[in-house]
Amino acid sequence: YWLSSLIGSQETADGYSKLIEDSKTIFYTFPESVPVYSAATEMAEGFTPFNDIQKQNAIAVLKHIETVTALSFVPTSEALESNTLVFALNTQEEDSYAYAYLPEIHPLGSDIYMAIHPTNETMSVGTEGALTLIHEIGHALGLKHPHEEAEGLGEVSVLPADEDSVANTVMSYEESTVENFKFEFGHLDIAALHYIYGPNPNARASDDTYEISSTQTNFIWDGAGVDTVDASKLETGVTFHLTPGHHDFVG
């Protein structure tokens, strides 16, 4: 259910994956003027390019994503191509900090518009703008809000209230604190991105050992190798599944 709460359906995940085919490449651009396909839309209102600091921070998020997924991000000057993240600012409603479009074949897919607002002045780590930025990039890669039902799936596509927090997923609206104002996806976000695009095959590629902790969440992912999950230091039993779709637990 934690995948359904961020992606929706298998069909949705397959659709996003097929957009990039086998290349695992997504392009990104910071246009100096509004893209032609958005010129007559609300996106053009107050259109403002990213400044250098904002560009650096957006690229830093993409670099983080490359470390945990099989995706590669390549700069381009062409916003019209599909599979392209377009970053810009514009004028939005008073209560809106940003919005982004889910991936699709139309060039508008994966476009990200940050509001011209003090929150988004730099989008640097330690500011609320950092969380807003990575949240919108999550949308542009196919992630939804965990509290919103996916069409036709009902409650199975909603994260339980006790798990719906920014500590688990940056796509959440709940329990946001300064500790979450960073360029790192939560463990549920990473699981969802792995499901769509696959893990980075070069990360954790050795024969690794993962020790299970009884005091914190154990989230394990691995790129390759013959790996070991070690619970020998625990004083209580462990319920552990090797099949997908389970929450394992200690005690």
Language-model region placement:
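Active-site scaffold of zinc-dependent metalloenzymes
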Residues: 26-40, 99-125, 170-174
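Zn2+-dependent metallopeptidase catalytic core
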Residues: 39-79, 224, 230-235
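Disordered inhibitory propeptide/activation segment of secreted metzincin zinc metalloprotease zymogens
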Residues: 1-50
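Surface-exposed patches in mature extracellular/periplasmic domains of secreted proteins
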Residues: 2-8, 12-17, 68-80, 147-151, ...
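The catalytic-center signature of Zn2+-dependent metalloproteases
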Residues: 88-107, 127-186
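Short pre-active-site segment immediately N-terminal to the catalytic Zn-binding motif
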Residues: 45-53, 114-133, 181
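Short, well-structured beta-strand/strand-turn elements
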Residues: 63-85, 95-106, 112, 121-122, ...
